[in-house]
Amino acid sequence: MKCLWCGEEVERAEPILSFLLGANRKCICVYCEHPFMELRQHPTCLECGRLMTKVEVCPDCQKWHQVKEAVLLKNTALYAYDEAGRKFMELFKFVGDTRVMTVVIKELRQELLKYQKRGFVLCPLPSSKASLRKREFETIPTLLEQCHVPAVSLLEHIGSGKKQSEKTRQERLQLKQPFKVKENVGVPKKVLLVDDVYTTGATIHLAAKALTEIGVEEVESLTLFR
């Protein structure tokens, strides 16, 4: 079997090891198991998790302070959205190769459990109907399922038009609400929104606004990349 990341041959694991690590573990060779820059080892923005030269609030977040829709308390990102991050998103989200999830599951699960211990209900950010028709699977719920952590689907996507990945930065910043809270759902006190990439922050801020409007008191977010 060839490594999904580098294309080199992957040594076959012993049967008991394959069972313990999961069937997909050996799709990635030992040299490619940790391909990303971990942001926790570097100075980042206090609010969005962006890579910085020193720990402070970045210019983008300072602008969000002036926007009434900005009710998100904080975003935590695991990895920098660099070449390796873009490669992961291409394989996972656009090619649809879910086996590549193995390079993020361990760290993602650890971070999710920390939020659960703090009383946060995990809520995946839903994909648009157009994206679902193309991919045929929900990326974030699929990740959460593999992490074996409970999550609640509180939101549905009601937006139309271009996918986020196809929009310009200016288009993403045009704040038109693409989410609504599902009917007959309980109102948690604290919600953690989970998404793949934080770019301008517009999508997550609007999701947070939809939740606070029904009475959620605290909304934070966790993304794979920033």
Question: PLM ranges: what are they?
Answer:
Residues 1-226:
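Glycine-rich phosphate/pyrophosphate-handling loop used in enzymes and phosphotransfer proteins
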